[in-house]
Swiss-Prot record:
ATP binds at residues 23-24, 65, 68-70, 131-133, 174, 184, 221. Gene3D superfamilies: 1.10.8.60, P-loop containing nucleotide triphosphate hydrolases, Winged helix-like DNA-binding domain superfamily/Winged helix DNA-binding domain. GO terms for molecular function: ATP binding; ATP hydrolysis activity; four-way junction DNA binding; four-way junction helicase activity. Pfam families: AAA_lid_4, RuvB_C, RuvB_N. Mg(2+) binds at residue 69. It comes from Colwellia psychrerythraea (strain 34H / ATCC BAA-681). Residues 4-184 are annotated as: Large ATPase domain (RuvB-L). It is an enzyme of class 3 (hydrolase). The gene is ruvB. Belongs to the RuvB family. This is Holliday junction branch migration complex subunit RuvB. One of its GO terms (cellular component) is Holliday junction resolvase complex. Its EC number is 3.6.4.-. GO terms for biological process: DNA recombination; DNA repair.
Length: 337
């Protein structure tokens, strides 16, 4: 099982959520990166407001930690409406969803995180709600049970997921707007780090922000978490001031290397290179070799390694790329010895 305190884990901790609420941007003009998403939402939101209509239902997907919840809250702020937040696993019964829907006001937003984890029963309730703003509910039990329709105010459903492929086609097709969030480039992450440092009352120069950003795996949540640990280091070692040397020393101490890899990333790549001669190797064999669940490897560890060109998924299995060998200073001949 993956370590719960993995520093570059993109899943939010309680501390992350507390700090994120304080420093996350509130409006699109303050939203850094994801230019393709930002450009589209700068059209869709004013258009809906000008017509006095709710925004079309919005699906946001992408790896964890990229700002799906942040974007949902920005949409609510830009639309000037309330947002009610829940998650797929919390909505166990149809009544749980019905209670939320019936308490929405006109043009409000219902945000469902991890929407791919909705039960089939709850999902069925969503269909008429999304299409016709109607709620079909059963009253009574047995032979006396009857179905009644309740009218709902127009609303926007925003769904967020790390696994868009796990959504059923009927649900996915009901979203009028679909946005994919990509990993951030280092320049945009540097801007985010500098902005967060301001909110944390931390003095950091451009080179220091860049050093934190380049080790943050393209993920704002990780950048902000690393920044808090760098702040701790700087408070003790450099009078609370962060430059490139301070940031590098802090992150080296935390065993986050120049590519943003931690021990789990290195363990995965070393297993493929050392135990399976670079691959191809099946996911189950990799999972057994490093003692990790295949879902964790697939959803948490691999996406960044693949996106950065250190790992390939092929029909025959996983393959470590030339870049992975170069990162560790290993030649392919060495693995054959």
């Amino acid at each position: 099982m993956i370590e719960a305190d993995r520093l570059i884990e993109p899943i939010a901790s309680v501390e992350d959520e507390r700090v994120d609420r304080a420093i996350r941007p509130k409006m699109l003009q303050d939203y850094t990166g994801q230019q393709h998403v930002k450009a589209q939402m700068e059209i869709f939101i004013p258009a809906a407001k000008n017509r006095g209509e709710p925004l079309d239902h919005l699906l946001i997907f992408g790896p964890p930690g990229l700002g799906k919840t942040t974007l949902a809250n920005i949409v609510a702020n830009e639309m000037g409406v309330n947002i009610r937040t829940t998650s797929g696993p919390v909505l166990e019964k149809a009544g749980d969803l019905a209670a939320l829907l019936t308490n929405l006001e006109e043009n409000d937003i219902l945000f469902i995180d991890e929407i791919h984890r909705l039960s089939a029963v709850v999902e069925e309730i969503l269909y008429p709600a999304m299409e016709d703003y109607q709620l079909d509910i059963m009253i009574g039990e047995g032979p006396a049970a009857r179905s009644i329709k309740l009218d709902l105010p127009p609303f926007t459903l925003i769904g967020a997921t790390t696994r868009a492929g796990a959504l059923t086609s009927p649900l996915r097709d009901r979203f009028g707007i679909v946005q994919r969030l990509e990993f951030y480039n280092v320049a945009d992450l540097s801007t985010i780090v500098s902005r967060s440092a301001h909110f944390l009352n931390l003095t950091i120069d451009e080179e220091g922000a860049f050093e934190v950003a380049r080790r943050s795996r393209g993920t704002p949540r990780i950048a902000n978490r690393l920044l808090r640990r760098v702040r701790d280091y700087a408070d003790i070692k450099s009078h609370g001031v962060v430059n490139q040397q301070t940031a590098a020393a802090a992150l080296d101490m935390l065993e986050v290397d120049s590519e943003g890899f931690d021990i789990m990333d290195r363990k995965l790549l070393h297993a493929i290179i050392d135990k399976f001669m670079g691959g191809p190797v099946g996911l189950d064999n990799v999972a057994a070799a490093i003692g990790e669940e295949r879902e964790t490897i697939e959803d948490v560890i691999e996406p960044f390694l693949i996106q950065q060109g250190f790992l390939q998924r092929t029909p025959r299995g996983r393959i470590a790329t030339d870049r992975a060998y170069q990162h560790f200073g290993i030649t392919k001949d060495q693995t054959k010895d």
